[in-house]
Amino acid sequence: MSDTAEQRWSVYLIRNNRNALYCGVTNDVERRFNQHQSGKGAKALKGKGPLVLEWSCAFENKSMAMKAEYFIKQLTKTKKELLVQESAVIQVGEGQSFVFYSRK
């Protein structure tokens, strides 16, 4: 098995100083967050610190993590805030699609 196949991939949400949530995918959340903080990450976060890692969720492989990232990016800010507050979850549904569930 290759190193890539054994890695856990995660989706994460980072809050910037404008209260916006940035969504990304990585195989090492701590390393990637440190890159964002040092200005070596996404252009969307440069100069918008302090940054706060608000949420992350691990997936079984890179493909699923990237699908989850796309799904989360399509959510409204309100729904992303529910994920951060742990008042909602996303789950893999039929056909490897994602479903948003509120915990109310």
From Swiss-Prot:
Transmembrane segments: none
Organism: Vibrio campbellii (strain ATCC BAA-1116)
Pfam families in UniProt: GIY-YIG
Family: Belongs to the UPF0213 family.
Name of the protein in question: UPF0213 protein VIBHAR_05350
InterPro entries: GIY-YIG_endonuc, GIY-YIG_endonuc_sf, UPF0213_domain
Alphabetized SMART domains for the sequence: GIYc
Annotated ranges, domain GIY-YIG: 7-82
